[in-house]
């Protein structure tokens, strides 16, 4: 086994490359003598930077090209941000490892103001996420939410150029890229419930490659896997993707799991919430239970409106 090479499919963004290098280092540490190389590529989501993700429509905007590389044997594993991974996989592929989660919170970044509450009336806030927009506008309906796409460096540069009073980014990405000092304040999960899987890195590979599954085993983090499993079950039951106003966050409490879920109108003012506590061994069922509770409260109408505006999913 030590003589073979593992090829990692990855996007070319700085954060994606960091994640791939992290997996590479972990594999080499766990399996001395194993050769690991990167296969960088550009996804559709990386190319379509002039439109909000919610307007592009479709799922798997950041993973499809990587999955094609796996299916065509141009790579052996693909490394993803879990919040970008669709709920269903192409035949022959599957998720076989979830690494330990980084800080899952959203980060408030500003050169002028200390926190969201400190923003003056009518301030311009940049985000590419309908999930963040729904929660921001419910809390602060006076804010102007402006479209913000691009990699982390690009988004920070736009803030520094004065295009925004503040921007909201995932804390995990800033921390991983060495920009932790740019986090003005972390937004609590009570004020901005994260996206399912936010802060976690997942590894996809061919279902038939049992030898690779064994190599990935030391990288798998059980607690993160249980939490993300519950979050993804909620997302799947709501037919969610990475560009819809769905939030969910699970934490472990001993042998139990506490899952909170949210669906919000991107225009603000209508946040539907639900939560459940139960045995962590029932993670998938708990996710479905919270999703159904949200649907019972009217989440379907909000999501249908968003899907209609985005085009086919």
From Swiss-Prot:
GO molecular function, one term: hydroxymethylbilane synthase activity
Cofactor: dipyrromethane
Pfam families in UniProt: Porphobil_deam, Porphobil_deamC
Keywords (A to Z) from UniProt: Porphyrin biosynthesis, Transferase
The protein's enzyme class: transferase
Documented EC number(s): 2.5.1.61
Cofactor note as given: Binds 1 dipyrromethane group covalently.
Modified residue annotations for S-(dipyrrolylmethanemethyl)cysteine: 242
SUBUNIT field: Monomer.
Family that this chain belongs to: Belongs to the HMBS family.
Note: The porphobilinogen subunits are added to the dipyrromethane group.
Name listed for the protein in its UniProt record: Porphobilinogen deaminase
The species this protein was found in: Pseudomonas fluorescens (strain SBW25)
The organism's taxonomic lineage, starting at the top: Bacteria, Pseudomonadati, Pseudomonadota, Gammaproteobacteria, Pseudomonadales
